[in-house]
Amino acid sequence: MQRRIFGIETEFGVTCTFHGQRRLSPDEVARYLFRRVVSWGRSSNVFLRNGSRLYLDVGSHPEYATAECDDLAQLVSHDKAGERILEDLLVDAERRLADEGIGGDIFLFKNNTDSAGNSYGCHENYLVARAGEFSRIADVLLPFLVTRQLICGAGKVLQTPRGAVYCLSQRAEHIWEGVSSATTRSRPIINTRDEPHADAERYRRLHVIVGDSNMSEVTTLLKVGSANLVLEMIEQGVQFRDFSLDNPIRAIREISHDLTGRRTVKLAGGKEASALDIQREYYERAVEHVAKRSPDPMAERVLELWGRTLDAIAAQDLSKIDREIDWAIKHRLLERYQAKHDMDLSNPRIAQLDLAYHDIRRGRGVFDLLQRKGQVERVTDDGEIEAAKDTPPQTTRAKLRGDFIAAAQAAGRDFTVDWVHLKLNDQAQRTVLCKDPFRAVDERVERLIASL
């Protein structure tokens, strides 16, 4: 694949219960979770030695933003490392609660909706060239993003006035605009706020906020890998059939409610097309595009998975993908549970199981139990994930940030960092500006570290 910088930001749902009853407010739980972070970082917004950012977002949601990655498998490992880092905080917070005589179980969920109907996100970031026509990228990408829940939705049991229904996407019900500069108030599909975290004359950061949080490593690979291929094609001038949607927001909900992928949505020109039709167009262009290049095992893996997922949905044979694609894995899980206990989808125990799928605590979370039983496929392994908790990607700017943080902490020096700045808080206030996210070696940073 053409080299690109990408990253994933994940907000986690949080609650604390004691014998099944809510014990603490989300604000209080978040404070306990981040107490260890604040004790060494003097803030609930910190960068870690693996290059990532960990912070408390609006509404008491812990958020983890991966370091800059330029490889899909690397990104999957760093996304999963975020779960492990937060799990460590969870264990520490439960210990503090017990020490204070409060007691209770803390739950962190990698999902997108809570029982009160609030939504929180999983945002993808893709670096694109400033020179490109951003409006064209958004126009061509929008139908792809609206329909890609078919291939990478997390699945959700939605309670409606007509009863419970199983949907492809958790996030679809909470998106209110196609393209916008806001993220929380209006929840668009693509966020246009121009914060490149890089040289603004050369780069722009495409901020996609429509995606579901994925438990499956394979689904994350397909989500980012397919979007990356579509971006690459747009940048290289590949022409697509015009699938501009008449009403993207209505379409995203209608598609989420149809597991067959065959329900048609209205296009801007008056015609209609199904989610399968639209996804198939992007997939077939991608197959042609990749065939013209030198062999690329990762792109070929993404294409094989993408094509097989579309074929499985078209044939309504989910057994072809129910070890890899989140919504299909969860669908299989819930169907088996329903059959075993003779209950319908509206039973509260189904809602509990739906939620437990996203519990990141190993040994308790349902997805983790499926993984331990060998019932889901993987991209990475536990060793790679463990390494990613402390080691930044070695081929991007994240290495400079991570190395600086590790060295400054070891030397006991006070420092401040963000995505582009590395600063020693001494009399000289020495600061290095790192504007190139592709650059993993920088003599200025080496000198700054040597001066510690």
From Swiss-Prot:
It catalyses: ATP + [prokaryotic ubiquitin-like protein]-L-glutamate + [protein]-L-lysine = ADP + phosphate + N(6)-([prokaryotic ubiquitin-like protein]-gamma-L-glutamyl)-[protein]-L-lysine. The active site is at D57 (proton acceptor). ATP binds at R53, T66, W419. Keywords: ATP-binding, Ligase, Magnesium, Metal-binding, Nucleotide-binding, Ubl conjugation pathway. One of its GO terms (biological process) is modification-dependent protein catabolic process. GO terms for molecular function: ATP binding; ligase activity, forming carbon-nitrogen bonds; magnesium ion binding; ubiquitin-like protein transferase activity. The keyword DNA damage does not apply. Its EC number is 6.3.1.19. Mg(2+) binds at E9, Y55, E63. It is an enzyme of class 6 (ligase). Pathway: Protein degradation; proteasomal Pup-dependent pathway; Protein modification; protein pupylation. Pfam families: Pup_ligase (PF03136). It comes from the Bacteria. Belongs to the Pup ligase/Pup deamidase family. Pup-conjugating enzyme subfamily. Catalyzes the covalent attachment of the prokaryotic ubiquitin-like protein modifier Pup to the proteasomal substrate proteins, thereby targeting them for proteasomal degradation. This tagging system is termed pupylation. The ligation reaction involves the side-chain carboxylate of the C-terminal glutamate of Pup and the side-chain amino group of a substrate lysine. The reaction mechanism probably proceeds via the activation of Pup by phosphorylation of its C-terminal glutamate, which is then subject to nucleophilic attack by the substrate lysine, resulting in an isopeptide bond and the release of phosphate as a good leaving group. This is Pup--protein ligase. It comes from Actinosynnema mirum (strain ATCC 29888 / DSM 43827 / JCM 3225 / NBRC 14064 / NCIMB 13271 / NRRL B-12336 / IMRU 3971 / 101).
